[in-house]
Amino acid sequence: MIKKVHHALIENELTKLRDKSSSSSQFRMALSQITSLLFFEVTKESPLEEIVVKTPFTKTKGYKLKNEIVLVPIMRAGLGMVDPIVRYSEKIRVGHLGIYREHEGTNVISYYKKMPENIGNSHVIILDPMLATGTTLATAISSIKKNHPIKISVVAIVAAPEGIKAVEAAHPDVDIYLAAIDEKLNKDNYIIPGLGDAGDRLFGTK
């Protein structure tokens, strides 16, 4: 299911991401802010486990997340979305997927996968700023499903309608959280209006 998150701060930071004059540092900070806000939405209704804690004065009821969270950034651009989330819990683990789509055609190349052990009781959150054709993300979800997590969600920043349609058709059970749904893909499969190549803008490369 597609879940576009509406928030004034997201719109403010998204404008910075789109602005071609933003420096890599400004791009990185805006990406971090939006990622945090989307993460709050992903985990808003996460199941909790009741525990007892001691305050300085007495015992009281408290809660902790029932399921572990595993982040899986799609390299490279997804790496910029990890740090804003891991600071919320020392128990968040991180896997990595190296997948890319060849610009000429729709062939997807999977070149790296490193996942934490025993994620069967985990909520996996895939991180990728751009959802363009959907072939890379659909491949990533299929790969992670082989590890049998309890739940898979996706945090992306900008998506094209074509990519949304492709991923929903392949994985209707996966929730996708977005900051924006853009107009279309151009002839080179870049999102329009988009924000350019997220990896290059994040790391200052070309």
Curated annotation (Swiss-Prot):
Uracil binds at residues 191, 196-198. SUPFAM superfamilies: PRTase-like (SSF53271). InterPro entries: PRibTrfase_dom, PRTase-like, Upp_B, UPRTase/APRTase, Ura_phspho_trans. It comes from the Bacteria. Allosterically activated by GTP. Gene3D superfamilies: 3.40.50.2020. GO terms for molecular function: GTP binding; magnesium ion binding; uracil phosphoribosyltransferase activity. Its cofactor is Mg(2+). One of its GO terms (biological process) is UMP salvage. Binds 1 Mg(2+) ion per subunit. The magnesium is bound as Mg-PRPP. It catalyses: UMP + diphosphate = 5-phospho-alpha-D-ribose 1-diphosphate + uracil. Belongs to the UPRTase family. This is Uracil phosphoribosyltransferase. It comes from Mycoplasma pneumoniae (strain ATCC 29342 / M129 / Subtype 1).
